[in-house]
Curated annotation (Swiss-Prot):
The keyword Transmembrane applies. Dolichyl pyrophosphate Man9GlcNAc2 alpha-1,3-glucosyltransferase that operates in the biosynthetic pathway of dolichol-linked oligosaccharides, the glycan precursors employed in protein asparagine (N)-glycosylation. The assembly of dolichol-linked oligosaccharides begins on the cytosolic side of the endoplasmic reticulum membrane and finishes in its lumen. The sequential addition of sugars to dolichol pyrophosphate produces dolichol-linked oligosaccharides containing fourteen sugars, including two GlcNAcs, nine mannoses and three glucoses. Pfam families: Alg6_Alg8. It catalyses: an alpha-D-Man-(1->2)-alpha-D-Man-(1->2)-alpha-D-Man-(1->3)-[alpha-D-Man-(1->2)-alpha-D-Man-(1->3)-[alpha-D-Man-(1->2)-alpha-D-Man-(1->6)]-alpha-D-Man-(1->6)]-beta-D-Man-(1->4)-beta-D-GlcNAc-(1->4)-alpha-D-GlcNAc-diphospho-di-trans,poly-cis-dolichol + a di-trans,poly-cis-dolichyl beta-D-glucosyl phosphate = an alpha-D-Glc-(1->3)-alpha-D-Man-(1->2)-alpha-D-Man-(1->2)-alpha-D-Man-(1->3)-[alpha-D-Man-(1->2)-alpha-D-Man-(1->3)-[alpha-D-Man-(1->2)-alpha-D-Man-(1->6)]-alpha-D-Man-(1->6)]-beta-D-Man-(1->4)-beta-D-GlcNAc-(1->4)-alpha-D-GlcNAc-diphospho-di-trans,poly-cis-dolichol + a di-trans,poly-cis-dolichyl phosphate + H(+). GO terms for biological process: aerobic respiration; dolichol-linked oligosaccharide biosynthetic process; protein glycosylation. The keyword Endoplasmic reticulum applies. Keywords: Endoplasmic reticulum, Glycosyltransferase, Membrane, Transferase, Transmembrane, Transmembrane helix. Its main location: endoplasmic reticulum. One of its GO terms (cellular component) is endoplasmic reticulum. It comes from Saccharomyces cerevisiae (strain ATCC 204508 / S288c). Belongs to the ALG6/ALG8 glucosyltransferase family. This is Dolichyl pyrophosphate Man9GlcNAc2 alpha-1,3-glucosyltransferase.
Length: 544
């Protein structure tokens, strides 16, 4: 009995989420013969979660004349089906003009081609605008394409990352599966892709593949995957300085000068871009069409930010009316300078110390710099820094896990105004509660309400254990107090938003309050990522 107790006490140091319902649900599959089962359980549960979110409304449902992102994606499937490639980036730009790189256009073409096989009226040119089938056939098809895209691009990349890291530091298979489930159950991505409606998981999955190839030291393949990510959604450029610095350093500085490696990487990068843009040149009208594509995917004329977003420009615009005091060209320059200053230390650190265990942190610092300071940022863009942030759920450091959990909650909170507009109130609340409960954030409550017969693992039923009396909070008192304070602020905001009307003179006051809370938290987390970069240089992947 004493040995068993000693093992139970030592266990939390080995597993990331020992004190969580997720650990307990997967605990019965610890025997060697059952270790393949957790992956299938996680896979099925991740798909079910996405399906249940998809049962709700989507962006722009029943809101003519422009509707929303659902209609935008459907419209791109429509025009790529019926128009020559030379018109894809020119057609009716006042409606939902195509404004993503060619890989998104080809993806839309393929999905539209398959969808037309089931029902051509879904994508009939011009006649299908705002189409909402009474039998929900179109909605079902569109939702299923996002799930399949998740399964093909995002799921394998995440599972591979957690397995690679787990094997590197001798983590148990069950620990690897728990880390994968925490990443796959991230609520923000699920709600935007499967609720609001987008295909961000394709871009993020391709980026994760690029990260995996860096870990495996397949540098040319990493470059190819990253270019594919950029060519699907240009926001992947938020990671570009780090990938550039890492690949350059690994070619010219570490372990030694290797011109052959640099040549192969450069060729792979240029060849991938050339292959993807070649159809626009040869089938779409030459350089004129490529120029129009680039003009569409970098819409500088729209302004420094769109709607309300938790970044520097939107929050400080309350005090300094940038659009009134500066020209668009000036704002472009200022945002460029601020963004470069923000990511330059991370880029230099990557160039001088291209270490694998620093990759998540430098990617966080770089992408968060773009989110906070760059031009034309949307609230959904927080999904870009959330990828490397959420990959840190593979960490075994309690403090890292607590901060990752907290910033994921903050990110979800900043998406509330958008999700509220889409009518995704229930999905927002349930996703927040479920994701936090699964990783143990309600551990101080759970064992007091669940009988032991419903707890298959050892930790959740141990009410007296210290791990069961605390939620996922850091050890540091200052951090703990600040995080609790932000949760109180978030709760207070939701109370105001639900029960108190904003002043008629300031109708966006509550939304700006949401942005202010998010901006403060994101800025502090961004600084924390730099702290980790400069204090973790001598560590290894085992210390991630």
């Amino acid at each position: 009995m004493a040995i068993g107790k000693r093992l139970l006490v030592n266990k939390p140091a080995e597993e990331s989420f020992y004190a969580s319902p997720m650990y307990d649900f997967l605990y019965p599959f610890r025997p060697v013969g059952n270790q393949w089962l957790p992956e299938y359980i996680i896979f099925v549960c991740a798909v079910i979660l996405r399906c249940t979110i998809g049962l709700g409304p989507y962006s722009g449902k029943g809101s003519p004349p422009l509707y929303g992102d659902f209609e935008a994606q459907r419209h791109w499937m429509e025009i790529t089906q019926h128009l020559p490639l030379s018109k894809w980036y020119w057609y009716d730009l006042q409606y939902w003009g195509l404004d993503y790189p060619p890989l998104t256009a080809f993806h839309s073409y393929l999905l539209g081609l398959i969808g037309s096989f089931f029902n051509p009226s879904w994508f009939a040119l011009e006649k299908s605008r705002g189409f909402e089938s009474p039998d929900n056939g179109l909605k079902t098809y569109m939702r299923s394409t996002v799930i399949i895209s998740d399964i093909l691009f995002y799921f394998p990349a995440v599972i591979y990352f957690t397995k690679w890291l787990g094997r590197y530091r001798n983590q148990s298979p069950i620990g690897q599966s728990i880390a994968a489930s925490a990443i796959l159950f991230q609520p923000s991505l699920m709600l935007i892709d499967h609720g609001h409606f987008q295909y961000n998981s394709v871009m993020l999955g391709l980026t994760a593949y690029a990260i995996n190839n860096l870990l495996d030291e397949y540098y040319a393949m990493a470059a190819v995957c990253f270019v594919l990510s950029i060519c699907f959604k240009q926001m992947a450029l938020y990671y570009a300085p780090i990938f550039f610095a890492y690949l350059l350093s690994r070619s010219l500085l570490f372990p030694k000068f290797n011109i052959a490696r640099l040549t192969v990487i450069a060729f792979a990068t240029l060849a991938t871009f050339a292959i993807i843009f070649a159809p626009l040149y040869f089938l779409g009208g030459g350089l004129k069409n490529i120029h129009q594509c680039i003009h569409r995917i970098f819409p500088f004329a729209r302004g420094i930010f769109e709607d309300k977003v938790a970044n520097f420009w939107c929050v400080t615009n309350v005090f300094v009316k940038y659009k009134e005091r500066f020209t668009i060209q000036q704002l472009q320059l200022y945002s460029l300078i601020a963004t470069v200053i923000g990511f330059l230390p991370a880029m230099i650190m990557t160039l001088l110390h291209p270490k694998k265990h620093l990759l998540p942190y430098v990617l966080i610092a770089c992408s968060m710099s773009f989110f906070l300071f760059s031009f034309q940022v949307h609230e959904k863009t927080i999904l870009i820094p959330l990828l490397p942030i959420t990959l840190l759920y593979s960490s075994t450091d309690w403090n890292v896990l607590s901060l990752v959990s907290w910033i994921n909650n903050v990110a979800l909170f900043t998406l509330w105004p958008l999700l509220k507009k889409d009518g995704l109130h229930l999905q927002y609340a349930v996703s927040f509660l479920l994701s936090n409960w699964l990783i143990g954030n309600f551990s101080f409550i759970t064992p007091r309400f669940l009988p032991k017969s419903l707890t298959p693992g050892p930790s959740i039923s141990s009410i007296n254990s210290d791990y069961r009396r605390r939620s996922l909070l850091p050890y540091n008192v200052v951090w703990k107090s600040f995080i609790i304070g932000t949760y109180i602020a978030m709760g207070f905001y939701h109370f105001l938003d639900q029960f108190v009307a904003p002043p008629s003179k300031y109708p966006d006051l509550w939304v700006l309050l949401n942005c202010a809370v998010g901006f403060i938290c994101f800025s502090i987390f961004w600084l924390w990522s730099y702290y980790k970069i400069f204090t973790s240089g001598s560590k290894s992947m085992k210390d991630l």
